Each structure stands twice: as structure tokens, then as C-alpha cells.
Amino acid sequence: MPFNLDELLAAYSTYQRFVALEPNPHHLRYIFPLFEGTYFAYRKIDVLRVTHIAKSISTKPSYIDIGCGYGDFLRKVREYIPNAIGIENDFTLFHILKKPKPDYIYLGPIEGFDKKAVDTAFVGWMEPGVDFRKFVASVANCVITTFDEGGQCGINGGCEYEEFGLQRIAYWRTPSWIDVNTELMNKYYTPSLLSQDTRSHLKSLRSSHNLWYVYSKKDFSNCVREGLHNWIQNEKTMTEMFDFESILDECGYHFKETLQASMSKEPLWEVIFDVDSHDLDGSFHKSPLMKSKDTDQ
């Protein structure tokens, strides 16, 4: 993602001053996601969903993370797909952080990528005003993308891939880093401004704005759907977590929790298969996002 150097340096200076206060290190990834985390909050279960979707296409899938930043999410994926690569259009961040660039992250725009098919492309963030979806759809058999429900990505908030010939298979909802940031700030960093009653009230209003969409080309839709469905059965007994997931729980974003103030009533991390996607038992999981369309017809 492109950065204004002066703004980046100013942000990094603020980050350094904050680090000097010795806060909870897990707070940093949600307060300064550019330097410590990602622009989307995730759990280990998200990493495993992504990797199992990729492996449903091939036992040794080709995988590319587009706009991977310094590779926070990509590193987690590489634990399961060792040949996964990333592409980043701006290496300024590596210089600012004084971090060596891994050899599996490549510099340049995605349009300069050697146009050969990849099994799975992950798009965790698309800079406002930038739109590379057409190219991604042309090279990837499966696209997994995350974006803020407010449409703060691409051109005119366009983050979907149906218009480029891909079929949406499923989606799930998680908090954005901003959602978590708000809860952390209210709880830990504005104590003099908020009474306990006020903090409790604000917590009851918390919402969740990040969506994960799974797309595929038609020829791969069945295996992607089946791979995701089969993996979900394993989640029922899964106990593995990243250490930083404790912050999500602490802020009220538990796995499968339903937020009372949210416009959408599906539980967090609940996989919803699209209206035209059958579960293996023949049932439908209809997306709540489709209801308004049905009503209009």
C-alpha cells in the first residue's frame, strides 16, 4: 500500500512514544496495526479456514497475499502453506521498522505479477482509490478477501468480485481493528473521561464491521465449498489460539458471540454459505445480506 513518507514517519514517532509507556504488547496490534498487526482482526481459526480452503483446490496450493504489508498474516499462513508468497507495492515500511524483507515478499504492483494461475489469492486490504480486482480475478481460482463493511476500500467502496466472473461461496464476520481499538481505548486509555457506567454502556453498543468473503471460479466452487464445510466440522473441538486472541475476548468479541447492537444477527465467525450454495447435507445457509434483495422482488 502506498504511504506518504512524512505521515508514516510521524505515525512511527507516535508509535515509539506509545511503546515507551510499556503497554500490554498485545494492545499494539490493534492500536498501531500498520506496525504491529493487520487492518483486520483475526484468530487462528481464520488462518486455518484460509489454508484449508486453499488446500481444497490442491494438496500443494499456490498462494499469494496481495498487499501483504510486512507479512503479519502471511507468516501465519506459511506455517501451513510453506510456499505461500506475498506482494507489496511499497517497501518503505520495512525501512522504517528496520526489518529485513523476507525473500517470499516481492515488491511491485499486482499487475506486474507474472500472469500465471494461482490457486488462492488473499486480499486483506485494498487502498482507497485503488482497484486491482479484475487482474486478481483473472489469475486466481479462489479469492479470499476481507474488507470493512463501511466500504473503505477500492474505488467507491467496491470490494466484491461477482462482476469479474467469480462466485461467492460463503462469508463470515469478525471485528475490524477499529472495533477492537475503540474498546481498548474506552477501557484502558480514557479512564479519566469515562465513568464505569459509561464504559459499560459503550461496551453494550459495540459492533463488528469486518467481512471475509470467499470467492471461486465456477469450476472450483464445489471443492472450495466442500473443503470449507469439512473444515468447519473440526472447529467444534479446536482449542488452539494465538496469544493475542485474549484481547478479542476481553473486548467482548468472543468466538460465535452475537452482538446485541449489531445490525446483523449472525454470530461472529459463523460461516454463512450463500443462498445458492448447498451444504453437504442438502440444506441452505441463507445469507442475511440477501434478505433485502428478496424483499424487493
Region locations from a protein language model:
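Conserved class I S-adenosyl-L-methionine
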Residues: 60-69
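C-terminal substrate-binding/active-site "lid" region of AdoMet-derived donor-dependent transferases
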Residues: 129-219
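Short amphipathic alpha-helix with an adjacent loop that forms part of the alpha/beta core around
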Residues: 54, 108-116
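Rossmann-like AdoMet/SAM-dependent catalytic core
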Residues: 183-297
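A short SAM/SAH-binding and catalytic strip from SAM-dependent methyltransferases
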Residues: 119-131
